[in-house]
Amino acid sequence: MVTVKFKYKGEEKEVDTSKIKKVWRVGKMISFTYDEGGGKTGRGAVSEKDAPKELLQMLEKQKK
């Protein structure tokens, strides 16, 4: 399992790619939503160059 490390509101976070629900591109950033548990949805973003290949593959799959 691959984890994505990112900063959100100044806080370092990481999330497993299996929890990511939706992925989209905003300029040179890859944004995503993920399941935080307890019915909560979290948001995050990572630069395209720092994104793991699994996250980029998820982005390509959602485009189709």
Curated annotation (Swiss-Prot):
As stated in the Swiss-Prot or TrEMBL entry, residues carrying the post-translational modification N6-methyllysine are 5, 7
Keyword Transmembrane applies: no
Give the pH-dependence text from the record.
Highly stable from pH 0 to pH 12.
* Location(s), subcellular: Cytoplasm
- Describe how it is modified after translation: Lys-5 and Lys-7 may be methylated.
Keywords of the record: Cytoplasm, DNA-binding, Methylation
Recorded GO CC terms: cytoplasm
Q: Which GO terms describe its molecular function?
A: DNA binding; RNA endonuclease activity
Q: How does it assemble?
A: Monomer.
Q: Which family does it belong to?
A: Belongs to the 7 kDa DNA-binding/endoribonuclease P2 family.
- Known role: Can constrain negative DNA supercoils. May be involved in maintaining the integrity of the genome at high temperature.
UniProt name for this protein:
DNA-binding protein 7b
Organism of origin is: Saccharolobus shibatae (strain ATCC 51178 / DSM 5389 / JCM 8931 / NBRC 15437 / B12) (Sulfolobus shibatae)
Protein encoded by which gene: ssh7b
